[in-house]
């Protein structure tokens, strides 16, 4: 299996991350119109930053993503951007969320991240199931 590497002028990299994060209070709100909105928002925000979504799954109470993040962006700054902007965009698109979550706090603090090496196929299967 050939690994796809990314490159800059003097650098080559192959960095993939498995990321999991939850809505505030781990509420089961990621369904129907919220689910489709979040998928669209995540794809748009990732394309703005040059982040490739390899695999992703929106569960009712958490999100799994397998992503390739460029070296110029740290994982923590990307997650701050992704969670912050997606929350603002969700509250703009679905104004009724403010009654469940308060003022513009859609995601819980923190997230889980793990680097992905040779076990990429295993993690893809885990995310899909």
Predicted regions and their residues:
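Basic nucleic-acid-binding interfaces
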Residues: 1-129
């Amino acid at each position: 299996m050939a690994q796809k590497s990314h490159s800059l002028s003097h650098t080559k990299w192959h960095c993939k991350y498995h990321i999991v994060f939850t809505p505030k209070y781990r509420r089961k709100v990621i369904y129907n119109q919220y689910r489709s909105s979040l998928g669209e928002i995540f794809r748009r925000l990732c394309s703005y930053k040059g982040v490739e979504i390899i695999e992703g799954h929106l569960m009712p109470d958490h999100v799994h993503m397998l992503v390739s993040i460029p070296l110029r962006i740290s994982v923590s700054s990307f997650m701050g951007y992704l969670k912050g902007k997606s929350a603002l965009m969700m509250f703009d698109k679905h104004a009724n969320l403010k009654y469940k979550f308060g003022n513009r706090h859609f995601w819980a603090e923190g997230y889980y991240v793990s680097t992905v090496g040779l076990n990429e196929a295993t993690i893809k299967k885990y995310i899909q199931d």
